[in-house]
Amino acid sequence: MTVNGWLQIGIFIAAVLLGAKPLGVYMAAVFERRHTWLDPVLVPVEKLLYRLTAVKAEEEMHWTAYCASMLIFSAATMLLTYLIERVQQFLPLNPQHLGGVPAQLAWNTAISFTTNTNWQAYTPESTMSYLTQMVGLATHNFWSAAVGIALAIAFIRGIARKEMKTLGNFWVDMTRAILWVLLPICVVFALVLTSQGVIQNLKSYTVAHVVQPQSQTQTVNGKTVTTTDSTQTIAQGPVASQEAIKMLGTNGGGFFNANSSHPFENPTPLSNMLEMISIFLIPAGLTVTLGQMTGSPRHGWAVLGAMLILWFAGVATCYWAEAQPNPLFHGVNQQATALQAGGNMEGKEVRFGIADSALFATVTTDASCGAVNAMHDSFMPLGGMVPLTNIMLGEIVFGGVGAGLYGMLVFVIVAVFIAGLMVGRTPEYLGNKIQAYDVQMAMLYLLIFPLIILGFSAVAVLTPHLGLPSISNPGPHGLTQILYAYSSATGNNGSAFAGLNANTSWYNLSLGFAMFIGRFLMIVPMLALAGNLAQKKNVPETLGTFPVTTPLFTVLLTSVIIVVGALTFLPALSLGPILEHLLLQAGRTF
């Protein structure tokens, strides 16, 4: 670990915190329909959209109607993406003449982008046409992020409102999230990325003649065959426009298979820093929005404090683990010097190094982004355990756009309930009595997540002809690959231990179901909880009310997240990355 590395980490989090308050205050104004500086331009566009779609903007929805609208919209857009993938060979903007996407892979991809997971069991350069990338996938990057923001705002309204049966209008919330929040930032961000070297074109792929042709010799049917490659195909495409929303919307699906380690997606250290900041910007801002809309700004900062504690613990552990030398490479100098990074540089880009790779891995899995600038499968066992653990916490450490906040607020309900039990009185949260139904919905939300991850992982491990053939490493690392895949899918993250071959019938179908359940089945109890809170009468604060604006609350919330979230998966982690670390220190490998 170096001073330079810690300085970059410090600059990153300082930039996020500086941007959180102005963006959070702005989003509160947007969703409370107060005046903003973009209104003269966007209000006419908004009204036109409502007129064209027959949306009655002033009519608010019960939580069941809000949920139904969200599900209908998601199902319709998922079907649209599936159809585009299947018939892309007949559509324009396909200069490489790529064929239609196979049915199971198209199903997996459509669910993936609808749920904000962006799991990619395919190589984009050789699978998706430009039209599919733009109309089928990039649009979902906006839609799925806007849905997440809308759901978070609905939950905040549930907390803030008293004796009301409605949570807002889904169509209005989603529209305003796109027009007022996502689009303006993405336009500016895409231009900045282009200035750094991110490409934006509709050209056919470029065939370049290499300076030194490469020869490969292999044995085929008992004969030695030598092939010489004198050209290289360089993929092109409209990358910058998709890269901006990929990061800002915590989507994560790469235009290229190498994702943000590809120089056309993330060419410079500055673009790398800006992409990381954009991942955390809206989730951090939403904690300020929470404080603004509930009338308790200090509560928003207390929630943000818990996120910061968990984030720092993760990035410090990952950075330390990756800066350590591999104990099996006895004959290699792995010490950091002026001319080499030292530590574990396998799977990392030299333009980023260990600090930025560890920071990016932590950020992308704290949020449900899933973009990568280094290969998580090549991390040291404990370094790779950090992104896995971040996902297993439910991705509430900043979390995905919107989804991270409502997931964190479910943990807040549980923490307040536990605090009430400790002092022997009915728990209260910002003027709401927390009763049996609220705790039941919160626990249902929290139980679905580990059941899906551990259930599917167990089936994959116990089926020699389904799950096991796809792992590239036997032993504990193979288990970690499977755990990571189902954690990433259920947590709507999308990153992977890429040594797992996920483009099989079993993984395309099972991971598709995991993504669907992890997104939509968990939303139902969350909205039910929000709807129930909105109907409650206001409970005046007394001396016995547990304060949710203090450092004590932040510590309690962090503790509940660790106990309820992390310890659930400790046995599985013990058989995966922890065991692999111990065996590595003992000189064992697989």
Swiss-Prot record:
It is found in: Cell inner membrane. One of its GO terms (cellular component) is plasma membrane. It holds the Pfam family KdpA. InterPro entries: KdpA (IPR004623). It is a multi-pass membrane protein. Belongs to the KdpA family. This is Potassium-transporting ATPase potassium-binding subunit. It comes from Acidobacterium capsulatum (strain ATCC 51196 / DSM 11244 / BCRC 80197 / JCM 7670 / NBRC 15755 / NCIMB 13165 / 161). The gene is kdpA.
